[in-house]
Swiss-Prot record:
Primary localization class, coarse: secreted
Full protein name: Cecropin-C
One Gene Ontology cellular component annotation held by this UniProt entry: extracellular region
Residue numbers bearing the 5-hydroxylysine modification: 21
Organ and tissue specificity: Hemolymph.
Function, as annotated: Cecropins have lytic and antibacterial activity against several Gram-positive and Gram-negative bacteria. Also has activity against fungi.
Secreted among keywords: yes
Signals that turn on the gene: By bacterial infection.
Keywords recorded for this protein, A-Z: Antibiotic, Antimicrobial, Fungicide, Hydroxylation, Immunity, Innate immunity, Secreted
One GO term (biological process): innate immune response
Coiled coil: none
Classification via Pfam families: Cecropin
Length: 33
């Protein structure tokens, strides 16, 4: 039961890290238009 929770937690952290890394690129693309 705990392994599933840990897996979801890790996945959520990966998604959050991806959003944080992508945010500046999205801003640059938005300014370029």
């Amino acid at each position: 039961r705990w392994k599933v929770f840990k897996k979801i937690e890790k996945m959520g952290r990966n998604i959050r890290d991806g959003v944080i890394k992508a945010a500046p690129a999205i801003e640059v693309l938005g300014q370029a238009k």
